[in-house]
Amino acid sequence: MTTLGVTGGIGSGKTTVCGFLEEKGARVFYADLEAKRLMQENADVRAAIVEAFGAAAYHEDDTLNREYLAEQVFGEAGRVERLNGIVHPHVFDAFEAAKERAADEGVSLLVHEAALLFEAGGDEHVDITAAVVAPEADRIAWVTARDDVSSGQVRARMQHQLSQEELRERADHVLENDGTLNDLRRKSAELYWAVTGGQ
C-alpha cells in the first residue's frame, strides 16, 4: 500500500483533488475533518483547548465556538502552533489507525489530506507528497464565496500556511490548479497513476 500526503493552501483545490483520487479507488483520510471532530468530541483535546484559549472556546451547548477560536488563533503569533500542538498528535494517531485498517482491507492508495501537512510533520507519516497550488486571486474568490468571510480573513489564514513557492519546493508532485475542473480531474488521474503504478 502506498500512502500519499496531499496538501495545499486554503482554497487551492486539495479537497477536490482528493475527491478525484477517491473516484479512482483511493481511500482518503481528511485530517482537517478529523481535527474538527476531535475538537468537538475528544475530552482531552477539549480540556486542553479550554485551558489554552478560555472557556469561550465552546458555546453553552458544548459546540465549538469556531469564530472565537479563529479570532484567538489567527490574532496573535504562536497561537496557531499552540492549537496545532494540542490537536495534531491525536490526528496522527487516527491516521496510523486508518493506515492499519486500509492495509488489512487491501487498499492500494491511502491519501492523507491536510492543509498543514509539512508544517505539522505529516509528511513524515506518508510515502509521497503532492501539493495543489492555484492563483492567489482565485483562492481568495473561492474561499470568500464558500465560507462567507472577507478577503482579509482569508489572507490572514494564508499567512499561517506555507507559501505556494515553499510547497512547490517541498512536495514530490505539484498540481497546478489554474485551468478548468476537467483539467484538475486529468491532473489528479495522472497523479494517481504516477504514485500507484497503475495498481
UniProtKB/Swiss-Prot annotation:
Chain positions recorded as ATP binding sites: 11-16
Example GO BP: coenzyme A biosynthetic process
Compartments, as annotated in UniProt: Cytoplasm
Gene Ontology molecular function: ATP binding; dephospho-CoA kinase activity
Domain DPCK: 3-199
Protein's UniProt keywords contain tRNA-binding: no
GO cellular component: cytoplasm
InterPro entries reported for this sequence: Depp_CoAkinase (IPR001977), P-loop_NTPase (IPR027417)
Keywords: ATP-binding, Coenzyme A biosynthesis, Cytoplasm, Kinase, Nucleotide-binding, Transferase
Annotated catalysed reactions: 3'-dephospho-CoA + ATP = ADP + CoA + H(+)
HAMAP family recorded: Dephospho_CoA_kinase
Family, similarity comment: Belongs to the CoaE family.
Database matches in NCBIfam families: dephospho-CoA kinase (TIGR00152)
Name of the featured protein: Dephospho-CoA kinase
Species this protein is from: Salinibacter ruber (strain DSM 13855 / M31)
Gene giving rise to this polypeptide: coaE
